[in-house]
């Protein structure tokens, strides 16, 4: 049959459907397309890639001109018509029937002759029905999985979700399915509320995507039209068991640790309070009913659902010797089900927690626990009903005898961390990376002691020897391990006590066994985003922050971890948390980059950067090359060719009495600049440039341009660093002087500057600290979505240029802005300028970290 097959057998519908199909075959017209300014009205959001070989694709709404909605008919094989081959069922999966057991009707059919169809069409012909798997109705279930049909209407930001997987790049080993990896807040999927992370997409309208390459699924979603029907499969949530436990406090209090709560979520999107550790010898361990992963619902008569972490801690502390607990225990799982994607954030082991006991501290620092760390997979927000890793199951389910485990290295390495190796205490598994080879095998457990690796005896090995054995083990690794939770618990307690001793020592005396820095307290500006929920190595409660945030580091004595609090425009936050030190950030980033090299920053102006039309004889390239990028490092000259790794910039608070200049960089900057001046002419203005070009009759000196008397004079001023940027066009010099910018700033207006990133540093040197905002596109597809006249090639060039811009000038940006629409980006920029317009600002400090 042809693609324009009619949706039913009646003559009335045939011609309508065939005509629509013929229209679809007409090629789109491109004659009216215009090549936009590369940094004109365009934007960003879309494709993204994960870590360690995982990938995802954010789905924008349709690129280019909006096409006519597709009217592809559903093909119904009968005894007379031979339709397309039905989709091949995925082995081990049930194939859902889209509309129950009755005949399928094309939803866009306007024909009223359904009775004619039912009389004229025989029942569908089934070949070898015994070989087919049982069908499932949509919005039904088979006990293990639930199937649902979801209809979404494409919004301004597309469908509002990201996907990963496919035959060519499985998101889950041995499963070619297409999985939802992210629901974008405010998008169509989020507003609808039915689609969830880890849902497996089986069908997009009439296209079977249960076993296709990733690009085919992306294409199906892009071409689905404004209304998209999805058939998805998801795991049935395991029911929780509610239990009441009475505990009698002992010398170690209640004997367990907790994490979670409002503002301190243990699992992103979940405010519940979870048990994260059972302390050896404590009341909880002796009672035996509480386990890691249990969810606390109430303490005595106090409800612990949707409360702050501090409230939960206070409720547990303010109890008598006999404590009544109400807990929810996770339900059982189908452990052998390989079609459920792993939950990359369901491990309740290494996140921040607080001990509930009489003498425990609620925070500690230190980097005693040395680890072999492997790259993490992408974070996927979980639900309470995520699969529970094997290492969270009941202790009695695991043998205490040595056992052989065979792991195959993947893109995430082996997927576990080790500790130990001092004084013959043994090598222990301290962390299982969710979704990594160790986790997916289900054989390795936190608390396992590693006895050997590929025949190499590690019973008395040092940490370095064990790490080396694991690193050189090859792709297939045979591990002999023995579950020794008591020994591991004693080791953990020793580490905890040692950390507290060192922390107390460093806090009280400023010295101790930690290698300390002379700087005990300082203010820094973050030059990267940090999400504490994605850091499995945190020794205590972490503090998340974004690029450009000001942090008050109240203790920088440790080499690996600092204590800090956020500084907002309204003052300092009360919450204190742990952040990675500058040294740790740089060490991790260098390990990630490995042999990847970037072009060294030069600080010279490029001829085609921000002055379209200027010749290659761009004047500043020869005369401003002395201005180079500074780094916050004090690295030796032998490393001069390496890019500085952005971590923190020391800052100091300064009072100013002028309106700060504004520099917008990235796609859509011209549109934003124009809108700011148009909407707020009393707040924003532009400065008068200088030129050696002769004045024309209708031009006014000092109003249209500052006309310089001689070329020699302007060349001298450029060499004397009186210009933030200059260039040559048609043998005439043009430039923006520092004095012109200062004149606007001292009148109380923000001077909007259309300059390159090099100007930021020159303004700082002139004590005119600009508000520099970088518009960072989310993806090539998002650029095309915000400017539908762009071709893919044009958007790709703009995206690449933006990435190079960030790489070259990232350390000088005040803030980085992203959004799904121009309006969203514009509103964010206005808010940033408002926040940065006070009389007190944070400026770079000459101090070294």
UniProtKB/Swiss-Prot annotation:
**Domain SH3 as annotated: residue spans:** 519-589
- Keywords assigned by UniProt, alphabetized: Phosphoprotein, Repeat, SH3 domain
Q: Where is the PDZ domain?
A: 149-235, 244-330, 404-484
GO MF annotations, alphabetized: ionotropic glutamate receptor binding; kinase binding; PDZ domain binding; phosphatase binding; protein domain specific binding; protein kinase binding; protein phosphatase binding; structural constituent of postsynaptic density
Q: Does the keyword Repeat apply?
A: yes
Q: Which residues carry this modification: Phosphotyrosine?
A: 705
Out of the domains of life, which is the source? Eukaryota
Which GO BP terms apply? cell-cell adhesion; chemical synaptic transmission; establishment of planar polarity; establishment or maintenance of epithelial cell apical/basal polarity; nervous system development; protein localization to synapse; receptor clustering; receptor localization to synapse
Q: Can you quote a single GO CC term?
A: synapse
Q: Which residues carry this modification: Phosphoserine?
A: 157
Q: Respond yes or no to whether keyword Ligase is given for this record.
A: no
> Which segments carry the region annotation Disordered?
32-101
Q: Residue spans with biased composition (Polar residues)?
A: 57-69
**Residues annotated as domain Guanylate kinase-like:** 659-834
Comp. bias (Gly residues):
41-53
Family, per the entry?
Answer: Belongs to the MAGUK family.
Which PANTHER family does the protein's record reference?
DISCS LARGE, DISKS LARGE HOMOLOG 3
What is the annotated role of this protein in its UniProt record? Required for learning most likely through its role in synaptic plasticity following NMDA receptor signaling.
Subunit description: Interacts through its PDZ domains with NETO1 and APC. Interacts through its first two PDZ domains with ERBB4. Interacts through its third PDZ domain with NLGN1, and probably with NLGN2 and NLGN3. Interacts through its PDZ domains with GRIN2B and SYNGAP1. Interacts through its guanylate kinase-like domain with DLGAP1, DLGAP2, DLGAP3 and DLGAP4. Interacts with FRMPD4 (via C-terminus). Interacts with LRFN2. Interacts with LRFN1 and LRFN4. Interacts with FLTP. Interacts with DGKI (via PDZ-binding motif).
Would you tell me the protein name for this molecule?
A: Disks large homolog 3
């Amino acid at each position: 049959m042809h693609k324009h097959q009619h949706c039913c057998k009646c003559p009335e519908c045939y011609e309508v459907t065939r005509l629509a199909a013929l229209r679809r075959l007409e090629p789109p017209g491109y004659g009216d397309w215009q090549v936009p300014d590369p940094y004109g009205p365009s934007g960003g959001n879309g494709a993204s890639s994960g870590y360690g070989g995982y990938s995802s694709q954010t789905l924008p709404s349709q690129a280019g001109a909006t096409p006519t909605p597709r009217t592809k008919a559903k093909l119904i094989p009968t005894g007379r018509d031979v339709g397309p081959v039905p989709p091949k069922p995925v082995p081990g999966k049930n194939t859902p029937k889209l509309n129950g057991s009755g005949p399928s009707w094309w939803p866009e059919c306007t024909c009223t002759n359904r009775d004619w169809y039912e009389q004229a069409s025989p029942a569908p012909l089934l070949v070898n029905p015994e070989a087919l798997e049982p069908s499932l109705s949509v919005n039904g279930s088979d006990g293990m999985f639930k199937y649902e049909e979801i209809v979404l209407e494409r919004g301004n930001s597309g469908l509002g979700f990201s996907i990963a997987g496919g035959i060519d790049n499985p998101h889950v080993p041995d499963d070619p399915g297409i999985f939802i990896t992210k629901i974008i807040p405010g998008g169509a999927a989020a507003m609808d509320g039915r689609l969830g992370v880890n849902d497996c997409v089986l069908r997009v309208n009439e296209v079977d995507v249960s076993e296709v390459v990733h690009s085919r699924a992306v294409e199906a979603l892009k071409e689905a039209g404004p209304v998209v029907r999805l058939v998805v499969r998801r795991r049935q949530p395991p029911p929780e068991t509610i239990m009441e436990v009475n505990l009698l406090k002992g010398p170690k209090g209640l004997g367990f640790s907790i994490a979670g709560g409002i503002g301190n979520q243990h699992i992103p999107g979940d405010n519940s309070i979870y048990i994260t550790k059972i302390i050896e010898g404590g009341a909880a361990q002796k009672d035996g009913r509480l386990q890691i992963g249990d969810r606390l619902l109430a303490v005595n008569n106090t409800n612990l659902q949707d409360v702050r972490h501090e409230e939960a801690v206070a409720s547990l502390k303010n109890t008598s010797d006999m404590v009544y607990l109400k807990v929810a225990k996770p339900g059982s799982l189908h452990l052998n089900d390989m079609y459920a994607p792993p939950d990359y954030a369901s491990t309740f082991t290494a996140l921040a927690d607080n001990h509930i006991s009489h003498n425990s501290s609620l925070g500690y620092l230190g980097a005693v626990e040395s680890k072999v760390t492997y790259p993490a997979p992408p974070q996927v927000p979980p639900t309470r009903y995520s699969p529970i890793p094997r290492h969270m199951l009941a202790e009695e389910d695991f043998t205490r005898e040595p056992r052989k485990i065979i792991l195959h290295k993947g893109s995430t390495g082996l997927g576990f961390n080790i500790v130990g190796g001092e004084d013959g205490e043994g090598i222990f598994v301290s962390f299982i990376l969710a979704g990594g080879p160790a986790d997916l095998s289900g054989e390795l457990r936190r608390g396992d002691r590693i006895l050997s690796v590929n025949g190499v005896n590690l019973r008395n090995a040092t940490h370095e020897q064990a790490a080396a054995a694991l690193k050189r083990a090859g792709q297939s690794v045979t591990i002999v391990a023995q579950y020794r939770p008591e020994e591991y618990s004693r080791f953990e307690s020793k580490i905890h006590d040692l950390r507290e001793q060192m922390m107390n020592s460093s806090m009280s005396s400023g010295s101790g066994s930690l290698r300390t820095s002379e700087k005990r307290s300082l203010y820094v500006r973050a030059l990267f985003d940090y999400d504490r929920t994605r850091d499995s190595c945190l020794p205590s409660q972490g503090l998340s922050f974004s690029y450009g945030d000001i942090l008050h580091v109240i203790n920088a004595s440790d080499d690996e971890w600092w204590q800090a609090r956020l500084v907002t425009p309204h003052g300092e936050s009360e919450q204190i948390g742990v952040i990675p030190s500058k040294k740790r950030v740089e060490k991790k980033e260098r390990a990630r980059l490995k042999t990847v090299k970037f072009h060294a920053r030069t600080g010279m102006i490029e001829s085609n950067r921000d002055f379209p039309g200027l010749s290659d004889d761009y004047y500043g390239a020869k005369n401003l090359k002395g201005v180079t990028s500074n780094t916050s490092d004090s690295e030796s000259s032998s490393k001069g060719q390496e890019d500085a790794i952005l971590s923190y910039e020391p800052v100091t608070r300064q009072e100013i009495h002028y309106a700060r200049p504004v520099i917008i960089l990235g796609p859509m900057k011209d549109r934003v600049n124009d809108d700011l001046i148009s909407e707020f002419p009393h707040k924003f203005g532009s400065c008068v440039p200088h030129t050696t070009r002769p004045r024309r009759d209708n031009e006014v000196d000092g109003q249209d341009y500052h006309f310089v008397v001689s070329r020699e004079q302007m060349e001298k001023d450029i060499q004397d660093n009186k210009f933030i940027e200059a260039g040559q066009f048609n043998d005439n010099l043009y430039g923006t002087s520092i004095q012109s910018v200062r004149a606007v700033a001292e009148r109380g207006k923000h001077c909007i500057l259309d300059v390159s990133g090099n100007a930021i540093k020159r303004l700082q040197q002139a004590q005119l600290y600009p508000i520099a905002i970088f518009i960072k596109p989310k993806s090539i597809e998002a650029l095309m979505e915000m400017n539908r006249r762009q071709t893919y090639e044009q958007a790709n060039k703009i995206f690449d240029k933006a990435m190079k811009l960030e790489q070259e000038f990232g350390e000088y940006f005040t803030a980085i802005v992203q959004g799904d629409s121009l309006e969203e980006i514009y509103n964010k920029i206005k808010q940033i300028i408002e926040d940065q317009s006070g009389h007190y600002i944070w400026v770079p400090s000459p101090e070294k970290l």
